[in-house]
């Protein structure tokens, strides 16, 4: 009987120790940051294969995904944020933009960036949950990331990419539209109207690029107001 009680107590202790880790792993903050990691892995892989096009595409995916979740890292550690954003990412972006990038030289930097990103994941997993409003900020930014891709794609003449990115934004808009509507009904209506017009414009066989860019910028302006408002709320301002 005593042995059975000890086994039960040990089991309860193990559950108690494991539960906080499980809760941390399930947090939206943790899962969202981990979801970005594969884009860095793809970047490293492309560099190892001496594939500049693949590296640019993968790192472009990272940049877009990072924009969604960087608020978490910036809030928890300005030092780590600056290392990832202003040091390593800025350097890799500039070097990959060169006509003939020296990929072997960039590989160690990309690996270092991946290692730093892994440290960020550990930091977040071990940290206490932030104000839940930061999750709302991240949700807004994650969805917005797709809209941010549209105008750059149009500038390079990549209509297919512009349509794809807007389609992803349109699809994910439903997940956060109530967040926007609750803050500002007028902004919500403006965004909805703008999205309808963008969708129609992009359906044309040869879209009017200048018109679409103007429409996208208009939607972005209203959307950014909501992001700024929720960010202030999260910071208690």
Residue ranges and their predicted role:
Residues 1-9:
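Bacterial N-terminal signal peptides that target proteins for export
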Residues 9-16:
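Bacterial N-terminal signal peptides
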Residues 18-24:
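Sec/Tat signal peptide C-region and signal peptidase I cleavage site
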Residues 24-237:
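Mature extracytoplasmic or organellar-lumen-exposed domains after removal of signal/transit peptides
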């Amino acid at each position: 009987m005593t042995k059975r009680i000890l086994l039960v107590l040990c089991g309860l202790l193990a559950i108690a120790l494991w539960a906080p880790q499980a809760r941390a792993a399930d947090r939206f903050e943790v899962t969202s940051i981990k979801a970005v990691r594969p884009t860095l892995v793809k970047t490293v892989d492309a560099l190892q294969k001496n594939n500049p096009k693949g590296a640019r595409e993968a790192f472009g995916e990272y940049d877009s995904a990072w924009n969604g979740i960087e608020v978490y890292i910036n809030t928890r550690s300005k030092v780590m944020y600056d290392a990832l954003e202003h040091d390593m990412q800025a350097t890799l972006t500039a070097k990959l933009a060169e006509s003939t990038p020296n990929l072997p030289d960039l590989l160690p930097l990309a690996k270092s960036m991946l290692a730093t990103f892994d440290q960020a994941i550990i930091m977040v997993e071990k940290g206490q949950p932030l104000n839940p409003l930061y999750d709302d900020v991240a949700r807004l930014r994650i969805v917005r990331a797709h809209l941010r891709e549209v105008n750059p794609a149009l500038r390079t003449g990549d209509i297919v990419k512009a349509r794809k990115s807007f389609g992803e934004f349109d699809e994910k808009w439903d997940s956060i539209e109530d967040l926007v509507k609750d803050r500002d009904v007028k902004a919500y209506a403006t965004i909805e109207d703008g999205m309808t017009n963008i969708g129609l414009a992009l359906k044309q066989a040869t879209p009017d690029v200048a018109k679409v860019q103007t429409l996208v910028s208009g939607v972005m302006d209203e959307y950014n107001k909501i992001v700024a408002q929720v960010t202030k709320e999260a910071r208690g301002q």
